[in-house]
């Protein structure tokens, strides 16, 4: 029987499917951070249960860490408690921890892949909604709740209903300067923030194959923003080249066997999806959001949409509410929207490729007057590589702030947050009301678009606003 990529991974991990109950699947990798794990570890302790698979559990500190100092004294009391509690729990259960002093510490969805923890064909879970990032490697990866975190810690399994399948094909090649962020925002703009609800999405097509692993991670990271359970890209030579030699990737004969297995991880030619969506890559322009969800997005050469043009009353009301919150007027050219904050980072866009793209726009220019711009690498490894390439100097000379790794301004959970009324060009994944701070307005863009906005003081079309020549 022909199968999709998702069905192959699902079937390989199905432990039991009791009649009338949710199936139980096996979990290969469990990623843990300081925010959603304390109650789970506490539950184990109270029940006197051991950790089922220490070697398959990996922890880091990212959500509440400071990007200005690696000292615990830089943290708020709540953040310090969470960080210290994670350290205590990892010590008590012998879990591998990448703490704030470890050179590989970073955002869980950045450091996991770069260490080779993320592998094709595996099932990966984490108490974080953007776990879908790891699907870029052909893994089935999704976020879970705290009670499920405890269940996985105790059993290395999870009750899970099987999802429907959706194929999203991006045909042809994108134009110069168009990134994975533009592709995924265009997809969400087409199908809506609930278009993928109930599905595991497989991204395919020439434009997807052309993406680097960094780009594929950006793509899958935002699968949750279209409502999908997970996003996946079938592994290929690009995947294998990225993984070879990484710390937790197979070595020697095991690597050769893994390659043979991974090359079978693709959707069979005659497999049938429950739903299919097609986009033409050449039609995708640089994207940016205008409202309060990722589906409220337009091209940079467009204008703020008018709710009066929307025939669906529910959608129209949502648009009106969003425009009132973000304080924009219908018909305003997107390039006329001024910003005063820029955030380049997050599990969506904080990898080395992202920082290179942003630095290309920043090089030889200066951050506009009245604009504060910060760059937060996604991990210690990314930070070191960027500094070895001199990217930090480019940012600093242009007037950007260069920070330590962490989730930072993606969410108003740490000290990096916006003030009421701030308007931010952000490379993160969510533009909900208050996401980056109470009363803040967020516009989601690619790293190049964010850096270009920082130096211009407003949104610009990077197809015109090109990097300066050396």
Swiss-Prot record:
Pfam family, one: Aconitase
Keywords of the record: 4Fe-4S, Amino-acid biosynthesis, Branched-chain amino acid biosynthesis, Iron, Iron-sulfur, Leucine biosynthesis, Lyase, Metal-binding
Catalytic activity, EC: 4.2.1.33
Reaction catalysed by this enzyme: (2R,3S)-3-isopropylmalate = (2S)-2-isopropylmalate
PROSITE patterns: ACONITASE_1 (PS00450), ACONITASE_2 (PS01244)
Pathway(s) the chain acts in: Amino-acid biosynthesis; L-leucine biosynthesis; L-leucine from 3-methyl-2-oxobutanoate: step 2/4
Tree of life domain: Bacteria
UniProt family annotation: Belongs to the aconitase/IPM isomerase family. LeuC type 1 subfamily.
Subunit record text: Heterodimer of LeuC and LeuD.
Alphabetized HAMAP family for the sequence: LeuC_type1 (MF_01026)
Name used for this protein in its record: 3-isopropylmalate dehydratase large subunit
Source organism of this protein record: Shewanella amazonensis (strain ATCC BAA-1098 / SB2B)
């Amino acid at each position: 029987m022909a199968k999709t990529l998702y069905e192959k991974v699902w079937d390989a991990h199905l432990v039991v499917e009791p009649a009338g109950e949710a199936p139980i699947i096996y979990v290969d990798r469990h990623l843990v951070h300081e925010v959603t794990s304390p109650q789970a570890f506490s539950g184990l302790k109270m029940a006197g249960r051991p950790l089922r698979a220490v070697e398959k559990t990996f922890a880091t500190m990212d959500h509440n860490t400071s990007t200005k100092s690696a000292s615990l004294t830089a943290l708020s009391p709540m953040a310090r408690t969470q960080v210290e509690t994670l350290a205590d729990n990892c010590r008590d259960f012998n879990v591998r921890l990448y703490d704030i002093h470890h050179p590989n510490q970073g955002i869980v969805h950045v450091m996991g892949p770069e260490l080779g923890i993320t592998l094709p064909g595996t099932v990966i879970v984490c108490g974080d909604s953007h776990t879908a990032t790891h699907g870029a490697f052909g893994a089935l990866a999704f976020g879970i709740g705290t009670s499920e975190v405890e269940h996985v810690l105790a059993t290395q399994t999870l009750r899970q209903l099987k999802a429907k399948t959706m194929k999203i094909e991006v045909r042809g090649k994108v134009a110069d300067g168009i990134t994975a962020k533009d592709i995924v925002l265009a997809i969400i703009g087409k199908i809506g923030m609930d278009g993928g609800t109930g599905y595991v999405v497989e991204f395919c097509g020439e434009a997807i194959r052309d993406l680097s692993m960094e780009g594929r991670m950006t793509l899958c990271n935002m699968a949750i923003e279209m409502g999908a359970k997970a996003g996946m890209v079938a592994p290929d030579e690009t995947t294998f080249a990225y993984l070879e030699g990484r710390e937790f990737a197979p070595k020697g004969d095991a690597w050769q066997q893994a390659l043979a297995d991974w090359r079978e991880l693709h959707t069979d030619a005659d497999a049938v999806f429950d739903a299919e969506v097609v986009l033409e890559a050449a039609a995708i322009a640089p994207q940016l959001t205008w409202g309060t969800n990722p589906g409220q997005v337009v091209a940079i050469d467009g204008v703020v949409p008018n709710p009066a043009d929307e025939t669906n009353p529910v959608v129209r009301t949502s648009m009106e509410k969003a425009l009132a919150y973000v304080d924009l007027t219908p018909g305003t050219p997107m390039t006329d929207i001024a910003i005063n904050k820029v955030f380049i980072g997050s599990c969506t866009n904080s990898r080395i490729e992202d920082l290179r793209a942003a630095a290309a726009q920043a090089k030889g220019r200066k951050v506009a007057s009245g604009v504060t711009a910060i760059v937060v690498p996604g991990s210690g490894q990314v930070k070191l590589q960027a500094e070895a390439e001199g990217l930090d100097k480019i940012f600093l000379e242009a007037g950007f702030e260069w920070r330590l790794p962490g989730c930072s301004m993606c969410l108003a959970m740490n000290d990096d947050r916006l003030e009421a009324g701030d308007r931010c060009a952000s490379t993160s994944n969510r533009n909900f009301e208050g996401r980056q701070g109470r009363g803040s307005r967020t516009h989601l863009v690619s790293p190049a678009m964010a850096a270009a906005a920082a130096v211009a003081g407003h949104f610009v079309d990077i197809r015109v606003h090109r990097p300066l020549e050396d």
